Amino acid sequence: MNIKNNINNRAINILNHETLVDINDLMIYSDILINDYSTTSVDFSITRKPQIFCLPDHQKYISYVRLDNDYLNNLPGSYVFSFKELIDLLNAVLMDDGEYSRKYRDQRINYIEKYYDVKNISSCSKFNQFINTII
């Protein structure tokens, strides 16, 4: 599937973020996340869907924002530095039959484990206790 040829044929739907109230709704309906440095990727990782990180300003960004030393290698998806690279990678991901998602499975799991307490099975009761303390 070639993105440039199919946008006009509506084979690819690009949703306007202003039409949805909650970004979590958008994540459910999205097949892929094109992201930058946003923590949205952490939440999107739970969906097990592919992610691409578009970082055209990376050199400038790291000059004023401190990132983990191994930031790029720990992302749950590939990163690109130009729009052309983005289009090429997006075309490849859309045609690969899930291989891209399988390739980044371990990074995605590590990402989720780093930012979520996935082993906590008492979240509901803790939330209930919290609500009771403020009522």
Task: List each language-model region with its residue ranges.
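Donor nucleotide-activated moiety binding/catalytic core segment of transferases
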Residues: 1-42
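Catalytic binding pocket for nucleotide-activated donors in carbohydrate/polymer assembly enzymes
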Residues: 3-10, 39-115
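Short, contiguous acidic/charged loop-to-helix segments that flank catalytic cores in large enzymes
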Residues: 15-22, 74-77, 115-118
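Residues within well-ordered alpha-helical secondary structure of globular protein domains
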Residues: 29-32, 92, 133
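C-terminal alpha-helical cap of glycosyltransferases
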Residues: 117-135
